[in-house]
């Protein structure tokens, strides 16, 4: 049981991480690694500044806390600090992957799965092929001096196939991937990937340059997702706005940025690579509208950025790993569905371009 220092805010995040990386280059095994590591990130805040420490010795957490507290200035009114007031005090256990835990799958089975995809890269017209299997499982606990006590897990795995199409008018390098939250989700995807690779080869061999000009474009779901991520998601990460009046004016809430049917959301609730039921400050995930009916309506926040802009937390304080402090970053960002069909979108873009 940790003893949190008095008159200071503090929190501790402990992570157990397991990762697997397998790589085949032109069919030859080049990498086969499994790693397990356990570490923690400790924070202390006195109302003026943060004191941080990362350690791979979680049994020394009390010493880490005490060392950081000795550097800080005790603040009897720390509970009234605008940052501290925004911290949620959640107590929960969300262990979603006890069944289907990737750590329980032998590496031999993972390698056999990867090899089952290798024949897709052995067709004519492909060179410099690379097949990869990646997975990660994280078991994370978070506790704070305010009383937060959270345990959660997440995991994901994927197959990535990369290649260069030969014989094309110009070099064409591309790749296809499949993502899943458990090992079973990566099985049986060969035919879909085979068709996608054939589509790439056909494109590389027959594509012609686009005539310069202005076009109405219809974006595939993948491209639309990248568009939402890059054009709206990053600008909504509110740490970019601190100290920049230009960014605040450019991204002012209430500003119209699109058609009235456009809504873009961010949330850690949906299962996927952005799944994050609680962020790394213990804030519960929720749906946050970045754009609603074409109007900027929200931003993504940590407790510090929410306090600085006098807004509410959103569950987007995320750390790369236990070696890093949490910063404001997206979870899952997407464009909300509308009422148009694919065919009606194409009819409305006659003479335009479809971006697959």
PLM region spans:
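N-terminal small-residue-enriched
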Residues: 1-356
């Amino acid at each position: 049981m940790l003893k949190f220092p008095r008159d200071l805010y503090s929190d501790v995040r402990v992570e157990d991480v397991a990762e697997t990386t397998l790589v085949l280059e032109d069919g030859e095994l080049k990498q086969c690694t499994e790693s397990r590591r356990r570490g923690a990130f400790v924070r202390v805040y006195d109302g003026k500044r943060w004191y941080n420490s990362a350690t791979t010795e979680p049994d020394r957490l009390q010493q880490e806390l005490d060392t950081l507290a000795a550097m800080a200035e005790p603040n009897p009114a720390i509970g009234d600090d605008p940052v501290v007031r925004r911290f949620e005090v959640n107590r929960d256990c969300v262990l979603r992957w006890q069944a289907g835990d990737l750590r329980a799958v032998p590496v031999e089975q993972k390698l056999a799965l990867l090899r089952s995809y290798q024949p897709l890269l052995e067709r004519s017209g492909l060179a410099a092929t690379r097949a990869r299997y990646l997975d990660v499982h994280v078991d994370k606990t978070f506790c704070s001096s305010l009383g937060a006590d959270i345990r959660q897990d997440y995991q994901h795995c994927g197959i990535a196939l990369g290649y260069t199409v030969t014989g094309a008018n110009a070099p064409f390098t591309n790749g296809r991937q499949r993502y899943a939250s458990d090992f079973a989700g990566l099985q049986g995807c060969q035919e879909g990937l085979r068709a996608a690779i054939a589509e790439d080869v056909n494109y590389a061999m027959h594509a012609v340059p686009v005539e310069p000009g202005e076009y109405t474009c219809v974006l595939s779901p993948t491209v639309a997702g990248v568009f939402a991520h890059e054009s709206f998601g990053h600008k909504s990460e509110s740490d970019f706005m601190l100290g920049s009046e230009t960014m605040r004016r450019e991204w002012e809430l209430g500003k119209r940025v699109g058609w009235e049917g456009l809504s873009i959301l961010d949330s850690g609730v949906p299962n996927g690579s952005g799944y994050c039921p609680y962020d790394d400050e213990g804030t519960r995930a929720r749906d946050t509208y970045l754009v609603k009916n074409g109007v900027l309506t929200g931003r993504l926040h940590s407790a510090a950025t929410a306090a600085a802009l006098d807004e509410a937390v959103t569950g987007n304080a995320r750390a790369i790993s236990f070696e890093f402090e949490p910063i404001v970053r997206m979870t899952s960002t997407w464009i909300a569905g509308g009422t148009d069909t694919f065919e009606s979108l194409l009819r409305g873009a006659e003479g335009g371009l479809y971006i697959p």
